[in-house]
Amino acid sequence: MKSDNKLLTMLSKLGVFVLAIGLITGCTEQRGEKSADLVYVNWAEGIAYTNLAKVVLEDKMGYDVEITSADVGPAYTAIAQGDADAFMETWLPVLHADYYEQFKDDIVDLGIVYEGTQSGLVVPEYVTIDKISELNDHADKFDGEITGIDAGAGIMKTTNQLIEEYNLDFDLIQSSGPAMTSALQRAIDDEDWIVVTGWKPHWKFGRWDLKFLEQDEDKVLWEKGNIHIMGRQDLAVEKPELANFLAKMHLTDPELADLMVAINESDEDNEVVARQWMQDNEDVIEAWIPADAQEAGM
């Protein structure tokens, strides 16, 4: 039975991978220069600025835009094969370093959309430890578990390395971004101890009092970095206006936090909230749009 379950799990994961590629593949077929096919991961910040990019391109520049959610691996594959125009969320220099090294010859770095990322293990402020090296002394309070996200995420790979490096007596639990924040919500409501894989930017830091556990100086696996937008190799030639727009797109920490909280707290569709944010922050987006493109979109 265990073997059958493992086989079903493998087939299920393969099916999801094929489905993701199938959704992405062909997006760019028979679509013109005034089209954009953007891929993002189902993480709070990616959802926020990908939907923002969509409404700006549509409303201000007259584009036909398709956005597709996919796991990190299929997203890189899509732009490397030219089946999508851009992947909106590459974390460098650490989290996506392996993916970037694998695909860098077939993709183009369009620029930084957000500066100052931070990743690591996150706990509520009421948890009375401050360092990763203190986790084992309190493993029972955490039920010996670190609540993670989707398996293909770079933060999951690094956390597995960290468990070995610090010799932690913990299991890394695979879930998803939304499942992780739900677990965090339940724990905080009851003031239970919980440790999760966390990153900034993320709306959870605006909702709850949280802290990153400190790394030992000789065991630093996470560094601060930036979020880049990666494009297909020929994007600047085939769609120069789109490439220029994506290269100029940039959000500060307060701007992105404001957008993420607005999306998370609203019952409206993400696109509707992003459009309202765009209308309320015209001064932010004007810098991204060429004057002639802005006129064409009006």
Question: What does each model-identified segment do?
Answer:
Residues 22-26:
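C-terminal motif of bacterial Sec signal peptides marking the signal peptidase cleavage site
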Residues 32-45, 63-68, 143-147, 246:
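Short, well-ordered beta-strand elements
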Residues 43-44, 64-78, 172-183:
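Short helix-initiation/N-cap motifs at beta->coil->alpha
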Residues 45-48, 161-170, 175-189, 226, ...:
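An extracytoplasmic/periplasmic, membrane-proximal ligand-sensing/linker region
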Residues 50, 70-104, 182-183, 203-208:
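Pocket-flanking alpha-helical
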Residues 53-62, 137-172, 279:
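Ligand-binding cleft/hinge of the Venus flytrap
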Residues 104-152:
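A conserved helix-loop-strand patch within extracytoplasmic ligand-binding domains
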Residues 118-128, 225-238, 262:
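A bilobed periplasmic-binding-protein/Venus flytrap-type ligand-binding module shared by bacterial periplasmic
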